[in-house]
Amino acid sequence: MRNLRLGTRGSQLALWQARHVASLLESSIPDLKVEIKTIKTTGDKILDVALSKIGDKGLFTKEIEKELLDGEIDIAVHSMKDLPSELPPGLCIAAVLEREDPRDVLLSHKNYSLADLPQAALIGTSSLRRIAQLKAWRPDLQLVDMRGNVETRIRKMKEQDLDGIILACAGVKRLGLEEMISDYLPAHLVLPAVGQGMIAVEARSDEQDVLKLLSRINHQDSFLAGQAERGFLHELGGGCQVPVASLAELQGGQLHIRGLIASLDGKEKYSGSSDCSPPEAEEAGRELARSLLQQGGAAILCETRK
């Protein structure tokens, strides 16, 4: 019997994702036993400051990646959207599971749909990407900074009597809370974060036997979409502190990728799309990013990062 040590954050959602990966591996590989190790990250420790103000990449991954590089664990499981656009030397994304619904959703204990939200509604979110796009759609919305895991945010929504909160659909569904969803935010209204809805499995680049094991659970269409979106993000040098978004989808054998750069107040935004063959996924994402930078996105990002 072979043992595989899996590192993950300790939130309910992170543990769900880790157990899901472990289950897939154990069911596809006889005599494999996966041990789960929880690791606390910087992002888990700093809960009273907006992510955009901490200003560090890898907030939810750095400590896990250190243990991976040091040989303390064999693989790491992440929400793809938490991974920095550039991985540490010696590490790679070895597998991506089939993508869950990438959209954002509205949760409202007052049962508001998007169309029902009152003037100056109080909406909780800490994402600059969501804030910029929501302001572009409804400048009247009062956006309240909100950090914490899914359960914490739901509790804060009720305690602070907010009209709603915006979360990633995937996390809500994976925790079995789908009945709490009041409405879905279409991608043309709020484009998702890079990698939203994807579970990524990271490994050491030189561990060929581990890479081979992980290839058994890889979903190639999702992997390619992730490459395109991460290519877009990498070209922008992005992370949690910049209001950018991207979504890639395979349609009829072609990869369709959309991208967005927006100002924090939602008054300026540059968006575009392109199509490519799957082998060109990453470069297509980079090329789309370069196009948006030239249109005016570079000035927005420069201003945002001041």
Swiss-Prot record:
Modification type S-(dipyrrolylmethanemethyl)cysteine: residues: 240
Please, which domain of life does this record's source organism belong to? Bacteria
Query: Which pathway is this protein engaged in?
Result: Porphyrin-containing compound metabolism; protoporphyrin-IX biosynthesis; coproporphyrinogen-III from 5-aminolevulinate: step 2/4
As to how many cofactors bind and how, the note says:
Binds 1 dipyrromethane group covalently.
Which coenzymes or cofactors are required?
Answer: dipyrromethane
Record keywords: Porphyrin biosynthesis, Transferase
Q: What class of enzyme is it?
A: transferase
Please give the SUPFAM superfamilies that the UniProt record associates with this protein.
Periplasmic binding protein-like II, Porphobilinogen deaminase (hydroxymethylbilane synthase), C-terminal domain
- What does the record list as GO biological process? protoporphyrinogen IX biosynthetic process
Q: What is its EC number?
A: 2.5.1.61
Instruction: Give the signal peptide range.
Output: none
Q: Molecular function terms in GO for this entry? A: hydroxymethylbilane synthase activity
Q: Pfam families this protein is in?
A: Porphobil_deam, Porphobil_deamC
**Entry GO CC:** cytoplasm
| Reactions performed catalytically | 4 porphobilinogen + H2O = hydroxymethylbilane + 4 NH4(+)
The record's section on InterPro entries has: HemC, Porphobilin_deaminase_cofac_BS, Porphobilin_deaminase_N, Porphobilinogen_deaminase_C, Porphobilinogen_deaminase_C_sf
- Subunit record text: Monomer.
Q: Which family does it belong to?
A: Belongs to the HMBS family.
- Add the further remark from the entry: The porphobilinogen subunits are added to the dipyrromethane group.
Role description? Tetrapolymerization of the monopyrrole PBG into the hydroxymethylbilane pre-uroporphyrinogen in several discrete steps.
Per its record, how is this protein called by name?
Porphobilinogen deaminase
Q: Which species is the source of this protein? A: Syntrophomonas wolfei subsp. wolfei (strain DSM 2245B / Goettingen)
Encoding gene per record: hemC
